[in-house]
Amino acid sequence: MDFALDKKYEMAQNLFREFAQNEVKPLAQEIDEQHRFPRETVEKMAKYGFLGIPVSKELGGQGCDILTYAMCVEELSKVCGTTGVIVSAHTSLCVDPIVTFGTPAQKEKYVPDLASGKKLGAFGLTEPGAGTDAQGQQTKAVLDGDEWVLNGSKCFITNGKEADVYIVIAVTGIVEKRGRKMKEISAFIVEKGTPGFTFGTKENKMGICGSSTYELIFTDCRIPKDALLGQKGKGFNIAMHTLDGGRIGIAAQALGIAEGALETTVNYVKERKQFGRSIAQFQNTQFVLADLATKIEAAKLLVYKAARKKDEYQSGAKVSYSVEAAMAKLYAAEVAMEVTTKCVQLHGGYGYIKEYDVERMMRDAKITEIYEGTSEVQRMVISANLLK
């Protein structure tokens, strides 16, 4: 197996890294402290084509693969976890399901504007009583003539109030499967500004504070009949497919956060002096850094493998990338939490001060163990595959 990256990946990586250092890093502390969505950064990313990386050129995207997209999220997240998740939620959770399951008319209507960054996307699955458990969904969609009527709410929605296009999962009936009555789940495309669609609570979060995380509320919200995404009753499959891809994005985010924390800590320990010498000369420091670097490299291999596996799938190969995505997300997220925690420790008291990036990075890392399926859910996915 060749682990070397082709020249095209190195060029893309350098572009993402340069943009992150010049355009994202200078604002990272400010947007965290002010809990401010970085609209100006999103507009710049749109000009660079970062919001349509894996979308075909025919639909207005860059025509690149999932690995290139993962590298973009990784490099952005090295300096700002917020910016990384904005791109991930937009691309994996909104653009991808429309490209994969949308009708030609839906693709033509929505994808070019999303891929160009003219519009931003979001995904509404989670509810107060339903996340991983799709059967716990309470949001309902009832067909009334030529319109669907949505009622219910969604919570913890990334890109919440800033998005323009939303994929919304709702109950469309009751069906019987294997002798059991179950909720029929369907997916819909909903636009901001639709009457009956409003925003509720803005979440005051521990980390990724610049991310717009809102409650979505639907009160007799009428959307066209053709807003149904995919087939009626196939919403669960669409949601699971979407989360599989989303896990690659979050794994890349976690990887980037871990890499950023290690990089800033290596620079810090070289300069920090104790007992007449830099703490980089202490064996304890060296061993901690060695362990963290090794785990980061292992996480990177898992993330890149999952991205390549999805590329194979999208090229028409009869393969699944669900387990690879779960493994990458599980391991990268837990590594990010370990790396950032130990990097704070190596900073000593300064690691607890907001002026130092590792403090923010540790707070940002925690959410990667939670959204797009908790670490426990990833273990369920992996073990189910082993035991089938």
Which residues does each PLM region occupy?
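Long, acidic (Asp/Glu-rich), low-complexity accessory segments flanking structured domains
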Residues: 219-238
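A short, Trp-centered hydrophobic/proline-enriched beta-strand micro-motif
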Residues: 117-125, 169
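Short Gly/Pro-enriched turn/cap motifs at secondary-structure boundaries
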Residues: 129-132, 156-159, 178-180, 205-212
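Flexible, small-/acidic-enriched active-site or ligand-binding loops
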Residues: 136, 193-224
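Short Ser/Thr-interspersed hydrophobic loop/turn segments at strand-loop and sheet-helix junctions
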Residues: 49, 73-77, 170-171, 190-195, ...
